[in-house]
């Protein structure tokens, strides 16, 4: 049994390649079933976003699993495997597990620490569960990944610092006002940066948003996104009297807000602070207004410096999270090892019960006078002896399975109890059953492939 992660993302493939390999939401159920029915596949999850398309699979063989995962992508999207292979990254076992944990924690995202990907990982897993294409391994692995992602965001500062210019302005405003609840926002210009900043302010509780733009239609369109109002530049002084926050990005060649009209507006504000964000180049707001009492002015360089500082802080937090991920990988591997010991336990029980059964047959032949009741009593007590003798070894072998050197210890356990023959027969039976299942178009048991491999 092997865990494989195969796919591409914004780091490995340009957008013109990524856009050809995106699963639409309505396609995913069918895609999951088709991937699961591919040879070697035992479990699967598909994670498809604007920045990544990744297949996570549990396969009974590494080589076969890799090949048929790539073949599935090529066939599904009608592309040549040779064309897409250079952009694919394939991770196996520990590396695949680590990658999933990093993705869920936001460490593999374009913006380190972003939280949206955690929800996308969770939804991908839940859909795979609904389509019944996950099993023992992925039910545990993805639950751990989602739980780890939540813990990372709640116990570290990875997602608390602004790493975009638009959101950095919001964070600065919170330091001045505490909250944007009840605050009035004035937007000068209807460009993308103004729109993004306005969205953040609106999401943080701004009471009203007014938009001024040279082109009235653009002002109306942007204002409508926030149930706001479009105003003309002729009303600028009045708007400055009312606004608590000013965002400016007009593209004008001269100052739109001068020290004079700002000073005039401030006289009528009765000491209310004015927070101004100038994200235009060249600047829209006369930097001299920062000398006026109760005016807080920040330009694009101020915001960019904050963003760069915050990015460095996020990288420091990412190092802490790396340690958390390593511990989580160890926990998952310990759990996974306990699955590998199941065939060993089964073989030992079967061997012991076979000995007990043979002994009972011998007793019945040699003591034919025993009553049916006597035989039942003897059978019960000899089975009890077997169970008591096995209790400690079976408890210990489960503990051994969770230790780092489990492979050597379990091999020794198998040798001591001479279980090689039983396990070989069990593995052959499983392999024969799996092959027959593929021929008949059936799914093999999710427990297949979990036999101890040495």
UniProtKB/Swiss-Prot annotation:
InterPro entries: 4pyrrol_synth_GluRdtase, 4pyrrol_synth_GluRdtase_dimer, 4pyrrol_synth_GluRdtase_N, GluRdtase_CS, GluRdtase_dimer_dom_sf, GluRdtase_N_sf, NAD(P)-bd_dom_sf, Shikm_DH/Glu-tRNA_Rdtase
GO biological process: protoporphyrinogen IX biosynthetic process from glutamate
Pfam families: GlutR_dimer (PF00745), GlutR_N (PF05201), Shikimate_DH (PF01488)
Keywords: NADP, Oxidoreductase, Porphyrin biosynthesis
Listed Basic and acidic residues bias regions: 432-442
CDD domains, A to Z: NAD_bind_Glutamyl_tRNA_reduct
UniProt miscellaneous comment: During catalysis, the active site Cys acts as a nucleophile attacking the alpha-carbonyl group of tRNA-bound glutamate with the formation of a thioester intermediate between enzyme and glutamate, and the concomitant release of tRNA(Glu). The thioester intermediate is finally reduced by direct hydride transfer from NADPH, to form the product GSA.
Subunit structure: Homodimer.
Domain notes: Possesses an unusual extended V-shaped dimeric structure with each monomer consisting of three distinct domains arranged along a curved 'spinal' alpha-helix. The N-terminal catalytic domain specifically recognizes the glutamate moiety of the substrate. The second domain is the NADPH-binding domain, and the third C-terminal domain is responsible for dimerization.
Function: Catalyzes the NADPH-dependent reduction of glutamyl-tRNA(Glu) to glutamate 1-semialdehyde (GSA).
Name this protein carries in UniProt: Glutamyl-tRNA reductase
Species this protein is from: Shouchella clausii (strain KSM-K16) (Alkalihalobacillus clausii)
